[in-house]
A protein has these predicted regions:
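N-terminal export signals
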Residues: 5-27
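Hydrophobic targeting/anchoring helices
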Residues: 31-139, 388
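Extracellular ligand-binding/catalytic regions of CAZymes and related secreted enzymes
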Residues: 31-40, 49-77, 255, 354-360, ...
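Helical hinge/lid and interdomain linker segments adjacent to catalytic or ligand-binding clefts
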Residues: 37, 42, 46, 76-86, ...
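Alpha-helical scaffolding within the catalytic cores
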Residues: 111-114, 158-160, 368-372
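Structural recognition of the beta-strand scaffold that forms the well-ordered cores
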Residues: 127-128, 172-173, 235-237, 383-387
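Catalytic beta-strand/loop cores that center a nucleophilic Ser/Cys/Thr
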Residues: 139, 146, 243, 273-396
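Serine-dependent carboxylesterase/thioesterase catalytic core
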Residues: 227-230, 242, 246-291, 295
């Protein structure tokens, strides 16, 4: 090779090498590309649910990221790193390139409107409370996390009582009965293999932990979860876990379980003896006394398993909050839809009359005596309750086929779930919510 050709080729190689700017952790951006990527979350987005996974993984890599509250329905801003662009492309998530002047215009728009730019600093370590043999489709949050590609661990009673909760930031509860009554299915589904398995598994766990009954063991688990929140943990619960967690917490020294659970009948005066100061969200509820009706109390507004009291499904509406004053509430309601079709669960909704005054209502069915989505603080941490079981399976009958989220990539109900996963990553500042 001639010296001239060698020099020309060497210079070309050096130029190609220096065309890649190195960002933190070694992720490269090719010179000439726009410096920023916007992940829009309005109707332009091709996969709303997987967009959360792209943002979560970017933050996990140490990438600087921001959540643009109320701008394009909760868009994400990320540096234009090659690994992020590739991740988004493989996930089928739409990104838009931004130049510095375009970003400056967006920031001006955010500053002047009911919007805010919230830095995302550290993704939470996520745990999902579920029995060891729970199928992945039995829990909407598990499905959402798997579909979005967000890492999580499954834990159950042994881990909770063994103090492992201290190693996590965010905990999800779903179709769990913390009153220890097997979802009150014991009499109506006696002999069903899935119920027999549930009963045997819970009785074995209670015995292994040294408790005299499943209700006693489940209440201890509920107290441990409340302590997790009090120490600064983030709790997100759906379906029966919302109502039964508070019932278990308030039932200090009160027998609220049917005889098939602990060998003694429920105290007929239990409602008057509940210690509601121990509960997170609810107070002054009236408990269901019948062991044959799979209903716990009048906390649930829809009473889906009581033929005489069952209410039809409607739609619920998300509230608007001030992004700069109430950033937490604003994060939790980011969505490309404000009105969302309702969906049943064993606990579908929360009656207004049983909400503590400190509760923030995030979504309601206008004119109805119940709300759908609520939030509050407990000690140093926060809790969020979302009624219903699966946003894309409104009736949710036992034995229904699993929901395929690839058919629902724009699900507004599942977006609310993923808002809860991501908001603990937001940079903390003085909040009024």
């Amino acid at each position: 090779m001639r010296r001239r050709d060698f020099v020309r080729q060497s210079c070309a190689s050096l130029l190609a090498l220096h065309a890649v700017q190195r960002w933190p952790l070694g992720w490269g951006r090719v010179r000439g590309q726009a410096p920023w990527l916007l992940i829009p979350m309005d109707d332009a987005q091709t996969d709303h649910l997987k967009a959360y996974g792209v943002a979560f993984r970017a933050v996990k890599r140490g990438t600087r990221a921001e959540w643009f509250l109320n701008y394009r329905n909760g868009a994400f801003l990320l540096p234009s790193e090659s690994v992020t662009a590739k991740d988004a492309a493989l996930a089928g998530v739409l990104t838009e390139a931004l130049e510095e002047d375009q970003l400056a215009q967006i920031r001006g728009q955010i500053q002047g409107g009911n919007m805010d730019a919230v830095p995302l600093e550290k993704p939470p370590k996520v745990a999902v409370y579920a029995p060891p043999n729970a199928p992945p489709w039995d829990d909407a949050v598990t499905m959402a996390l798997n579909y979005a590609g967000i890492d999580f661990d499954k834990i159950w009673d042994g881990e909770v009582l063994g103090q492992k909760l201290r190693t996590y930031d965010w905990l999800h509860l779903h179709h769990e009965d913390f009153t220890g009554q097997y979802s009150k299915f014991f009499l109506n589904y006696a002999g069903a293999p899935w119920l027999v398995d549930m009963v045997n598994r819970n009785r074995a766990m209670a015995q292994s932990q040294g408790f005299p009954s499943v209700p006693a063991e489940k209440r201890a688990v509920a107290v441990a979860i409340a302590n997790f929140v009090e120490r600064g943990g983030f709790l997100f619960a759906m379906c029966t876990a919302t109502e039964t967690l508070d019932l278990a917490l308030a039932a200090d020294g009160v027998d609220i379980a049917a005889a098939y659970s602990d060998g003694t009948p429920m105290d007929p005066n239990a409602s008057a003896k509940m210690k509601w100061d121990r509960a997170l969200a609810f107070h002054n509820a009236q408990l269901e006394l019948s062991p044959t009706i799979p209903v716990y109390s009048d906390i649930d507004g829809h009473q889906v398993n009581s033929p005489e009291r069952r209410q039809p499904l409607g739609s619920f509406t998300l509230f608007n909050f001030s992004a700069k004053i109430d950033p937490v509430a604003t994060m939790l309601v980011q969505n490309h839809r404000q009105v969302i079709p309702d969906f049943y669960g064993l606990t579908t909704s929360f009656t207004r009359k049983t909400l503590k005054p400190s509760v923030t209502v995030l979504a309601e069915e206008p004119g109805a005596p119940w709300v759908k989505y609520i939030h509050g603080e407990h000690g140093q941490g926060t809790w969020t309750f979302f009624g219903g079981h699966d946003p894309e399976d409104p009736q949710h009958q036992i034995g229904d086929v699993p929901t395929d989220l690839s058919l629902h990539p724009h699900s507004p109900g599942y977006r609310l779930i993923l808002n809860n996963v991501l908001f603990p990553a937001a940079k903390k500042k003085e909040l009024k919510t």
